[in-house]
From Swiss-Prot:
Pathway: Isoprenoid biosynthesis; isopentenyl diphosphate biosynthesis via DXP pathway; isopentenyl diphosphate from 1-deoxy-D-xylulose 5-phosphate: step 2/6. GO terms for biological process: isopentenyl diphosphate biosynthetic process, methylerythritol 4-phosphate pathway. The lineage of its organism: Bacteria, Thermotogati, Deinococcota, Deinococci, Deinococcales. It comes from Deinococcus radiodurans (strain ATCC 13939 / DSM 20539 / JCM 16871 / CCUG 27074 / LMG 4051 / NBRC 15346 / NCIMB 9279 / VKM B-1422 / R1). This is 2-C-methyl-D-erythritol 4-phosphate cytidylyltransferase. It holds the Pfam family IspD. CDD domains: CDP-ME_synthetase. Signal peptide: none annotated. PROSITE patterns: ISPD. The record marks 23, 29 as: Transition state stabilizer. Keywords: Isoprene biosynthesis, Nucleotidyltransferase, Transferase. GO terms for molecular function: 2-C-methyl-D-erythritol 4-phosphate cytidylyltransferase activity.
Length: 232
C-alpha cells in the first residue's frame, strides 16, 4: 500500500532507536538480531509499505543496517528528545511513532490506526488488560486493582504532526517527561483514540522477550501467519 512519492510526505513513520538497551544487556537494543535480522530492520519493514517515509533516530556514530529503507538522524539524550528531533526532521502531516523493539506489527493494526488518526488526529494501539492486577506492598500482596477499563498501551501511535509538536514544546517548557507520546497529548486535553492492538506487539526488553521473539519468527518470516485467517 505504498503511497505515491511527493515532495512533501503525507505520512511518516518515526522510530526513536537511540536507547542503550541496558536491561537486555546486548548493546543498543534496536540492533539486536532476531533470527539474523535486527529489531530495527523488522520494524522498518513492517511500517514502510504504509507510509511515505521512515525516519530513525540512532545513537551518535551509528549507521542504519544495510538495506533498511529509511533515513537516519542522531537521537536525543532521552526517548522524548529523540521524538522531538524526529518531528523536526520530517514535513509529513501525519506521523506514526513506533518503538523499534516491537518488531511484529500486523498490517490490519496499522490500517486501523491510520483510519483512527484520519478521524480524530490522535490515536494509539492498546490492549485491554487481561491479567489480575495487584498493588504490591514491598514483596507482598497489597491491594487488588480492578482491571475494568484498563488498557496496556503499545505502539505504533499516530498523530497529526502539528498537534504532537505543540505537545512536545509544552512538555519541554514545563520540564515534563512522559513515557510515551499519547500521554503528552492527553495532558493537553486532546482525546486519544484507543485502537485494539495485538499480543504480538510486545516490546523486547528482557532475555525472555528475546527468546519469545526468536520463537515467533518461525511463523512470521516470509509472511504474516500466526493466527487463523491472516494472510501469508
Amino acid at each position: 500500500m505504498s503511497a505515491p512519492h511527493t515532495s512533501s510526505p503525507r505520512t511518516a513513520a518515526l522510530i526513536p532507536a537511540a536507547g542503550s538497551g541496558t536491561r537486555l544487556g546486548l548493546g543498543p537494543k534496536a540492533f539486536v538480531e532476531v533470527a539474523g535480522r535486527s529489531l530495527l530492520a523488522r520494524s522498518v519493514a513492517a511500517l514502510a509499505p504504509f507510509v511515505d517515509e521512515v525516519v530513525v533516530a540512532l545513537p551518535a556514530g551509528m549507521d542504519l543496517p544495510a538495506g533498511v529503507p529509511a533515513r537516519a538522524i542522531v537521537g536525543g539524550e532521552t526517548r522524548q528528545g529523540s521524538v522531538r528531533r524526529l518531528l523536526e526532521a520530517t514535513e509529513a502531516g501525519t506521523v506514526l511513532i513506533h518503538d523499534a523493539a516491537r518488531p511484529f506489527v500486523p498490517p490490519p493494526v496499522i490500517l486501523a490506526l491510520l483510519d483512527a488518526i484520519a478521524a480524530t488526529g490522535a490515536a494509539t494501539v492498546a490492549l485491554p488488560v487481561a491479567d489480575t492486577l495487584v498493588r504490591a506492598e514491598g514483596q507482598s500482596w497489597g491491594q487488588l486493582v480492578p482491571r475494568e477499563g484498563l488498557w496496556a498501551v503499545q505502539t505504533p501511535q499516530g498523530f497529526r504532526r502539528e498537534l504532537l509538536l505543540q505537545a512536545h514544546a509544552r512538555a519541554e517548557a514545563e520540564q515534563y517527561a512522559a513515557t510515551d507520546d499519547a500521554g503528552l497529548l492527553a495532558r493537553l486535553g486532546v482525546q486519544v483514540r484507543l485502537v485494539p492492538g495485538d499480543a504480538r506487539l510486545f516490546k523486547v526488553t528482557t532475555p525472555g522477550d528475546l527468546a519469545l521473539a526468536e520463537a515467533l519468527t518461525g511463523h512470521v518470516d516470509g509472511g504474516w501467519l500466526t493466527v487463523e485467517g491472516e494472510k501469508r
